[in-house]
Amino acid sequence: MKILIASSHGYKVRETKAFLKKIGEFDIFSLVDYPSYTPPKETGETPEENAIQKGVFAAQTFRCWTIADDSMLIIPALGGLPGKLSASFSGEHASDKDHRKKLLEEMLLLENPIDRSAYFECCVVLVSPFGKIFKAHASCEGTIVFKERGSSGFGYDPLFSKHDYKQTYAELPEEIKNQVSHRAKALAKLQPYVEMAFANHLLARNESL
């Protein structure tokens, strides 16, 4: 069964490949294999809206099953920021490090800088070649630390410490983060839909023999 990971981000691709390999033998490819591909502009207000935009567009383009995701970091003390601006907090073409720098600067301006609670919201979707959408949501609560810690991961990982863990996402071993992160939890909820699609694929293939 051919399946596309609608991402060109190496970390996300590795995580999703590992997830799929636990389910069955897929012909897996990603947007890393198509550097000329231009994804749609993310205009959604929520992770679900953005994930669906990315997933449906890619499924229509490549005519195959597609997995897409979107996440937002929400900090109540900042009025919900960065929220839908998570990927462009300090500018559309700025780096992850630039976004983290701006976030720490914004946290310094808080009336109560001790209130550093935050959470990630994530949606992962599975889209069929015909546009049928299956979706799963998850979130992770934590805090924003006072300075960057750790060198792995991406995005806001060096600043986000999940509740029940002393380390930031960027300090956790990749195999641990891939079990406890918001994306990992959403993928786990999506698993029954992926298994169903794979089983239907095997059934159709056997009937054609």
UniProtKB/Swiss-Prot annotation:
Cited Pfam families: Ham1p_like
Key words of the record: Hydrolase, Magnesium, Metal-binding, Nucleotide metabolism, Nucleotide-binding
Note on how the cofactor is bound: Binds 1 Mg(2+) ion per subunit.
GO biological process: nucleotide metabolic process; purine nucleoside triphosphate catabolic process
EC number(s) per entry: 3.6.1.66
GO cellular component terms listed in the entry, alphabetical order: cytosol
Cofactor: Mg(2+)
Active site residues of this protein: D70
Enzyme class label: hydrolase
Residues the entry annotates as binding Mg(2+): D70
Keyword DNA-binding: no
Gene Ontology MF, one: ribonucleoside triphosphate phosphatase activity
Binding site residues for substrate: S7, S8, H9, G10, Y11, K12, S71, F154, G155, Y156, D157, K177, H182, R183
Catalysed reaction, written as an equation: XTP + H2O = XMP + diphosphate + H(+); dITP + H2O = dIMP + diphosphate + H(+); ITP + H2O = IMP + diphosphate + H(+)
Top-rank taxon: Bacteria
Alphabetical list of HAMAP family matching this protein: Non_canon_purine_NTPase
Annotated family: Belongs to the HAM1 NTPase family.
Functional summary from the UniProt entry: Pyrophosphatase that catalyzes the hydrolysis of nucleoside triphosphates to their monophosphate derivatives, with a high preference for the non-canonical purine nucleotides XTP (xanthosine triphosphate), dITP (deoxyinosine triphosphate) and ITP. Seems to function as a house-cleaning enzyme that removes non-canonical purine nucleotides from the nucleotide pool, thus preventing their incorporation into DNA/RNA and avoiding chromosomal lesions.
Assembly mode: Homodimer.
Name of the molecule in the record: dITP/XTP pyrophosphatase
